[in-house]
Design a protein with these regions (language model features):
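Short acidic/polar hinge/loop motifs at secondary-structure boundaries
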Residues: 131, 137-138, 143-170, 218
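Outer membrane beta-barrel strand-and-loop segments of large Gram-negative receptors
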Residues: 375-378, 384-411, 447, 459, ...
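Gram-negative outer-membrane beta-barrel transporters
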Residues: 420, 476-480, 596, 601-603, ...
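Membrane-embedded beta-barrel scaffold of Gram-negative outer-membrane proteins
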Residues: 217, 335-363, 535, 541-551, ...
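Conserved C-terminal beta-signal and adjacent last beta-strands/turns
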Residues: 30-31, 221, 400-409, 414, ...
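Structural signature of Gram-negative outer-membrane beta-barrels, strongest in the C-terminal barrel
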Residues: 281-287, 409-412, 424-426, 457-602
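N-terminal periplasmic accessory domains that precede
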Residues: 96, 117-119, 141, 154, ...
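Transmembrane beta-barrel wall of Gram-negative outer-membrane proteins
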Residues: 208-303, 328-332, 401-405, 409-426, ...
Length: 797
């Protein structure tokens, strides 16, 4: 599908709006496709070709809070994709990888659970998740709190969720830093005092040429009087592995010693266990004020690596040490909603998010190759170290603490002049410790047995902001919205590291210089937004937006060589993404068809990129590198063709391009003008179909999902590519209870509330490249989970 473009879909004389959009986006190669789709929408809005007997089967309406107030998604003049509770359940969405598979606007770069990074609209800085790297370009929220973290986002289990909202494009006004390319919001279910509700889900799946998946999920909603309710959900999941750690050897250059990994050989060794719960207490006061207290806890422990070694063959690798990933996080949140007057309502939220990761990783190939680039040869004369086993592994401990508080007020009216005004305060700390261990290193040289190098770093970021938006009606059909966020960010970095247990210079080895450093960086700015929305009629909304998103500034950690060179920056500046967007939303054919689309051009100025220079700095650093432009087209279509058949098609076309030559700090051309941003496919689409029917008086369904991701580059140098790929899932489900029968007619009466589903995930057993890492002298890639066939029992009381 290279160079895939929709052809213009209209030939009639252009109207003034079309001419205006043509002029604004004349340099965007997708503009004609977009205007063609818009013309179809306008044409449909004046026709009704469907039978009256089918008029009640309209596309589901979804209420979202992306604009900080509850709004029908079709009335919201911004690009938002919402995945409802019904769709989450029907498609068995359990983690962020599943969410990304349903949105063509999201690009996922994965190296395994807890180590996934994602981008919206192709805003990829090419980073690799280093803890010393730049902040994320996409914000990730659980309810009212951002939980994005440097070096890999948390992956909460998706169960008992009300909806997922994907806000596309910069959201700097209402959502602040890291909402640069967009925002993903996980909205959990609230307690409901109106009645008792409970259920459970049991699942088992068999992985092709792998192990098995098993899960148990449950929830209960308990009214505690007329105004109070408690909602609890919990899960216990074991996901089997499919990657084999195969026998291998490595020989070291200086000593000629050869070691093998026989102690670590294992089939299907990349398994993961997950468990957690969420407790939420809600109380509605007689005054109309609601109080909501929530606590979430999640723990996952994974064994092995999701990365495979290309030289070993498909779904195989060779590791010379144990690799584990233990990820625990909790979120405690208090939310109060109420009215200050008949015309003004308020929301107060304060949340604490804590996360701890313990991580081990095999670094044997790093010793074998990259150290020769980083240090003098004598540093690896293993005879000098009296070492015949130079394998290495590192142990990392990360502790994230994030506290955020927001208070906002807004007018209660849904039309006329309306406004929102708020303040946001956040403090986050990342304390991470990494130890590089060489078990056979000579104890003569190290004060701590087996230790080669250790670092202890504390990274603190704080943000204070005032934000607001105001909407004025210019006419009965046209609204103008102006928004602004004034913010101040502060970053502090305390770093210390040293070789062989010494945080200062080594007493014997002159090259082994330790260090203790402190860095600080402050930054303040304003992020604006302008939006104009026009209701062409009751079915079609047109809008145009200018918005900005940003990532905060920060500091780097430098060693002595880097400081003395004077070319590695001690700090880096904030980067800004400006967005020009024109879109439409249409609900057509008596609600049976929804067609939405937008055309956008985004300019990314002085964007932050994380990189290495091995002969100067053995750790990652961030620099502002240059300018890129990302142009794109997004289309969403939903069809309820009949009462029993529905379909959807979503499309994203992206043109991510460097607008100037990029040079590295040593003056070498690293990225020529015109190259594409790393990891960004130029085309993606997602197609779904669902058919409901009756089998022997029992309700049944079959659904099919298909996604396509185009080719992308592994780096901004545009040399190696990730091939395009498709993934498909198939589901068949039935309600064991007879349609219209009494309990006595069923084998067991309780089956009236049960459903049974057989599913086939990754139908074609595809193994696409989802992530790539080549920093070890070999290439490590993350692929897709193999074909999995399973059975799921769902019961609702």
């Amino acid at each position: 599908m290279n160079n895939f473009l929709l052809k213009p879909l209209f030939e009639k004389k252009a109207d003034p709006l079309t001419l205006l959009l043509r002029d604004i986006f004349k340099d965007n190669k997708y503009a004609m496709s977009y205007l063609g789709a818009l013309s179809i929408g306008l044409g449909f809005s004046h026709t009704n070709t469907l039978n009256a007997e089918e008029a009640d089967s309209s596309v589901e309406e979804i209420i979202v809070t992306a604009s900080k107030r509850a709004t029908n998604i079709q009335d919201l003049p911004m690009a938002v994709q919402a995945i409802s509770a019904e769709e989450l359940e029907a498609k068995n969405i359990t983690d962020f990888d599943d969410i990304a598979a349903l949105s063509p606007s999201i690009t996922l770069d994965s190296s395994g659970t807890g180590n996934s990074y994602f981008y919206i609209r192709g805003v990829s800085d090419g980073g690799f998740g280093n803890r010393a790297g730049a902040q994320a370009s996409t914000a990730y929220y659980i309810d009212e709190q951002p939980v994005s973290t440097i070096g890999g986002n948390p992956d909460p289990h998706i169960y008992d969720i009300n909806r997922v909202e994907i806000l596309k494009g910069p959201q700097g006004t209402l959502y602040g830093s890291s909402s640069q390319s967009g925002t993903v919001r996980i909205i959990t279910n609230k307690p409901d005092p109106s009645g008792f509700e409970a259920g459970f889900d049991i699942e088992r799946g068999d992985i092709h040429d792998g192990s098995t998946d098993e899960s148990l999920e449950t929830f209960v909603n308990i009214p505690l009087g007329t105004n109070t309710a408690l909602r609890i959900s919990a899960y216990d999941i074991s996901n089997g592995g499919w990657i084999d750690n195969v026998p291998s050897t490595v020989s070291f250059y200086y000593t000629g010693a050869t070691i093998d990994n026989s102690s670590y050989v294992e089939d299907d060794y990349n398994w993961i266990d997950k468990s957690g719960h969420r407790i939420r207490l809600g109380h509605d006061m007689d005054s109309g004020t609601t109080i909501d207290l929530s606590f979430l806890s999640h723990e996952s422990f994974s064994n092995g690596s999701w990365e495979t070694d290309v030289v070993e063959g498909a779904r195989k690798n060779s590791r010379f040490a144990d690799e584990t990933f233990d990820d625990e996080f909790t979120q405690t949140s208090l939310t109060i909603n109420g009215n200050l007057s008949d015309d003004i309502e308020f929301t107060f939220n304060t949340s604490i998010f804590d996360r701890e990761i313990d991580y081990t990783y095999d670094y044997t190939n790093y010793v074998y190759t990259n150290y020769y680039d980083s240090y003098s040869a004598y540093a690896y004369d293993y005879d000098y170290y009296a070492s015949t086993d130079a394998r290495m592994f590192y142990v990392e401990n990360d502790q994230y603490d994030r506290q955020s508080t927001e208070f906002r007020m807004q007018s209660t009216n849904d039309s006329g002049f309306r406004w929102i005004l708020g303040v946001f305060i956040e403090d986050q700390e990342l304390a991470y410790s990494t130890t590089y261990n060489m078990p056979a290193i000579s104890n003569i040289l190290t004060s701590v047995p087996g230790r080669w190098w250790k670092q202890d770093n504390v990274r603190e970021d704080s943000q204070k902001a005032i934000f607001g938006e105001a909407t004025w009606p210019l006419s009965d059909k046209t609204d103008l919205t102006v928004g602004m966020r004034a913010y101040k960010n502060e970053a502090d970095f305390d770093a210390k590291d040293g070789y062989m247990g010494y945080y200062q210079d080594h007493p014997i080895l002159s090259w082994a210089a330790g260090r203790t450093e402190k860095y600080s960086k402050d930054f303040s700015d304003v992020s604006p937004k302008i939006n104009i929305a026009h209701k062409l009629n009751d079915d079609v909304l047109l809008y145009a937006t200018y918005s900005e998103g940003f990532r905060p500034s920060g500091t780097n950690r430098l060693n002595r060589q880097a400081r003395e060179s004077g070319i590695v920056p001690a700090t880096y500046d904030s980067d800004t993404l400006t967005n020009f967007e024109a879109g439409f939303k249409s609900t057509l054919a008596d609600g049976k068809i929804v067609l939405n689309g937008n055309l956008h051009t985004m300019n990314w100025d002085d964007f932050q990129s994380t990189s290495y220079i091995y002969d100067l700095l053995t750790v990652a650093f961030v620099q502002n590198v240059g300018q890129a432009t990302i142009s794109g087209l997004e289309l969403e279509s939903y069809f309820n063709i009949s009462d029993s058949f529905s379909a959807s098609l979503m499309l994203a076309l992206t043109d991510p391009e460097f607008k100037e030559d990029i040079y590295d700090l040593q003056g070498q051309l690293s990225t020529p003008k015109g190259n594409q941003l790393a990891y960004v496919p130029t085309e993606q689409f997602v197609m779904s179909m669902n058919k409901d029917f009756v089998i022997r008086n029992r309700d049944a369904y079959i659904s099919y999902d298909h996604s396509y991701t185009g080719e992308s580059y592994q780096s901004s140098a545009n040399t190696d590519t990730n091939a395009s790929y498709s993934l498909a899932n198939l589901r068949f489900g039935v309600n064991p209870s007879s349609k219209g029968s009494s309990d006595a007619d069923d084998i067991v009466g309780f089956l009236q509330n049960a459903s049974l589903e057989v599913y086939l995930e990754n139908v074609h057993d595809s193994d696409p490249t989802l992530g790539i890492y080549d920093d070890f002298g070999d290439v490590r890639r993350t692929g897709s989970k193999p074909r999995t066939i399973g059975l799921r029992l769902r019961y609702r009381f």
